[in-house]
């Protein structure tokens, strides 16, 4: 479903109403992007429901009642869930070869409508200031966490099990002279979201991390056991390319995150 940016407050309110009572059958992804065909700033909502179409239409009726400017409702088998096209998913991606992307992420535990509204306006200003970077997107992912919370936190290495929302901006840099300014916007986004996240410190899903550090990705409480496992199974720190658990200062200084294996002898 595609919505005008002016519908943002209504969308945030629906998301807040769902809150922590999100059915386990429901998965929501909001993507704020720029699309000239639809008047510039848009909000796409990719809503999935595991179950009958009739249940899905009832569950997503609050979104449909807002009269999206574009919508596509389909029923697909499990085998096609990742390959099926998503409305509004065209354009550049952080995973495209040769793409220069600056990603900034935050875990959220509460939904602050004022913070989301301010961030939307800042993104509109960003698109105006950096028209060559209008392939950039802001993503908000909301999944049911009832099953995640059913596992005790100290039983696994997976941190931040009570996360309500995963959000990030993927800022596309198509003009090298704008690196600093675009990264400054990303840092501002991360600070704004973290301040309204529901916790006093920054927490980031490890796969979305950049340079925040291992305590932010894995949590301080889990690091002692993780480092013990690292010393046992990877004492040479060979598997340390991306957001690793570090066990030596020397390796921390020498690791090259730009190319897998470039520092291996």
Feature-to-residue mapping (PLM):
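Soluble FAD-dependent oxygen oxidases
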Residues: 1-265
């Amino acid at each position: 479903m595609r919505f005008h940016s002016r519908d943002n407050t209504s969308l945030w309110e629906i998301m807040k109403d769902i809150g922590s009572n999100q059915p386990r059958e429901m998965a929501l992804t909001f993507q704020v992007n720029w699309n000239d065909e639809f008047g510039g700033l848009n909000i796409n909502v990719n809503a999935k429901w595991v179950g009958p179409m009739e249940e899905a239409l009832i569950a997503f009726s609050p979104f449909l009642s807002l009269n999206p400017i574009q919508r596509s409702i389909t029923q697909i088998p499990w085998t096609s869930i990742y390959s099926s096209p998503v409305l509004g998913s065209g354009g550049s991606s952080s995973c495209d070869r040769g793409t220069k992307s600056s990603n900034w992420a935050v875990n959220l535990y509460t939904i602050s409508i004022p913070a989301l509204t301010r961030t939307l306006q800042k993104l509109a200003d960003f698109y105006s200031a950096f028209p060559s970077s209008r392939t950039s997107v802001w993503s908000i992912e909301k999944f049911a966490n009832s099953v995640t919370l059913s596992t005790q936190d100290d039983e696994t290495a997976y941190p931040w099990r009570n996360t309500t929302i995963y959000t990030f901006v993927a800022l596309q840099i198509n003009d090298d002279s704008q690196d600093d300014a675009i990264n400054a916007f990303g840092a501002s986004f991360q600070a704004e979201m973290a301040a309204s996240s529901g916790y006093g410190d920054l927490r980031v899903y490890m796969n979305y991390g950049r340079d925040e550090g291992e305590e932010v990705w894995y949590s301080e409480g889990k690091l002692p056991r993780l480092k013990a496992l690292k010393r046992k199974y990877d004492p040479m720190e060979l598997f340390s390319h991306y957001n690793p658990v570090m066990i030596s200062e020397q390796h921390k200084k020498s690791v090259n995150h730009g190319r897998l294996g470039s520092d291996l002898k």
